[in-house]
Amino acid sequence: MDIDPYKEFGASVELLSFLPSDFFPSIRDLLDTASALYREALESPEHCSPHHTALRQAILCWGELMNLATWVGGNLEDPASRELVVSYVNVNMGLKLRQILWFHISCLTFGRETVLEYLVSFGVWIRTPTAYRPPNAPILSTLPENAVVRRRGRSPRRRTPSPRRRRSQSPRRRRSQSRGSQC
């Protein structure tokens, strides 16, 4: 079965694959972030959003994976075999979970549309030859301010007219006073 965990959120494994593996924070940092920002919602018996549900599931999967790793570490006698298992878990499964955790935490923090815009912007940036692209990659936290990709159905932001300068009222008064004195 080929299951894409991002499909229902409008993204895909392919879209996230444009981000390099060292882009994603460590599992520990992601778990700390999720706990600091969303602990109450994650521990709540009530349904908050599909992102909260996916985040709960990813956290539970990571916990079970750590239980398995602990069991393997305690039951595998051969240090070389143990190292192979730990390495496989960290490289393959760890990366997938880091991607999933990052995606859902980012969607909850910045909004799904902003994260999708970021993934598209980064994908375009990374595939553009170095000579033709800006030196710095797009940054998620600044994307809403200078996004090239516009949301559908949203009109571009209009500029606010600059405030008119107020003229001093005193010259008018003087004129009217001087005219009044002439008459």
Curated annotation (Swiss-Prot):
Stretch list, region RNA binding: 177-183
Residue positions, PTM Phosphoserine: S155, S162, S170
Biased segments, Basic residues type: 149-177
Entry's Gene Ontology BP terms: microtubule-dependent intracellular transport of viral material towards nucleus; symbiont entry into host cell; viral penetration into host nucleus
Gene3D superfamilies attached to this UniProt entry: Viral capsid, core domain supefamily, Hepatitis B virus
Highest taxon above the source species: Viruses
Motif stretch (Bipartite nuclear localization signal): 158-175
Subcellular location as annotated: Virion; Host cytoplasm
Sequence repeat placement: 155-161, 162-169, 170-177
Predominant location: virion
Record's GO cellular component terms: host cell; host cell cytoplasm; T=4 icosahedral viral capsid
Region span, Disordered: 143-183
Modified how: Phosphorylated by host SRPK1, SRPK2, and maybe protein kinase C or GAPDH. Phosphorylation is critical for pregenomic RNA packaging. Protein kinase C phosphorylation is stimulated by HBx protein and may play a role in transport of the viral genome to the nucleus at the late step during the viral replication cycle.
Gene Ontology molecular function terms on file: DNA binding; RNA binding; structural molecule activity
Family annotation (SUPFAM superfamilies): Hepatitis B viral capsid (hbcag)
3 X 8 AA repeats of S-P-R-R-R-[PR]-S-Q: region residues: 155-177
Quaternary structure (record): Homodimerizes, then multimerizes. Interacts with cytosol exposed regions of viral L glycoprotein present in the reticulum-to-Golgi compartment. Interacts with human FLNB. Phosphorylated form interacts with host importin alpha; this interaction depends on the exposure of the NLS, which itself depends upon genome maturation and/or phosphorylation of the capsid protein. Interacts with host NUP153.
Family membership noted in the UniProt record: Belongs to the orthohepadnavirus core antigen family.
Function: Self assembles to form an icosahedral capsid. Most capsids appear to be large particles with an icosahedral symmetry of T=4 and consist of 240 copies of capsid protein, though a fraction forms smaller T=3 particles consisting of 180 capsid proteins. Entering capsids are transported along microtubules to the nucleus. Phosphorylation of the capsid is thought to induce exposure of nuclear localization signal in the C-terminal portion of the capsid protein that allows binding to the nuclear pore complex via the importin (karyopherin-) alpha and beta.
Descriptive protein name: Capsid protein
Organism: Hepatitis B virus genotype B2 subtype adw (isolate China/patient4/1996)
Organism placement in taxonomy: Viruses, Riboviria, Pararnavirae, Artverviricota, Revtraviricetes
